């Protein structure tokens, strides 16, 4: 009986890891759609989002079934409660990639981004995808040290976001209010994507150690 239970726990981790992978792919494609004004790629992200939503619902259901039927304690209870929190975080990652793709679609055939911020978003997108891929890995490995590294890499995203904001506030900005609003919202989408990847890593650390990092700050509270 317990063997079957732990197999179900492993299957749940695999589902969560797969969801992280799909969210990372979605953000990578959404970024390319944004940078290249690629309508077909944006549409693909929008269409494929249903895969993440479906897997999210199934993973959440699996976690609640385990919680209700198995009455887990200690480490197993931590694993299931953390999994429920991860489902929500990964689901939001997918939704944020969807927002990026929808922005690219809405402005097509024009480019959303002024040329001077393209480089920022290429790098912001790269970091976001790297964080998503890192979350995918640690969900399976449950390695708290690697999970801590994801939290450290999020500093790069924060720094890029600060630089982007300074560009928007510069008196030399000449692209108007609408472009500034688009850039601000898009920057926020990427920042929140990273925050949710960090939340996944934070939950992995809790799963493995029974406590949150000593320097812990809940993502999004900064």
Curated annotation (Swiss-Prot):
Annotated S-S bridges: none
Protein keywords: Cytoplasm, Phosphate transport, Transport
InterPro entries, sorted: P_transport_PhoU, PhoU-like_sf, PhoU_dom
This protein's GO CC annotations: cytoplasm
MF-aspect GO terms: protein homodimerization activity
UniProt superkingdom: Bacteria
A Pfam short name: PhoU
Family: Belongs to the PhoU family.
Self-association and partners: Homodimer.
Full protein name: Phosphate-specific transport system accessory protein PhoU homolog 1
Source organism of the structure: Mycobacterium leprae (strain TN)
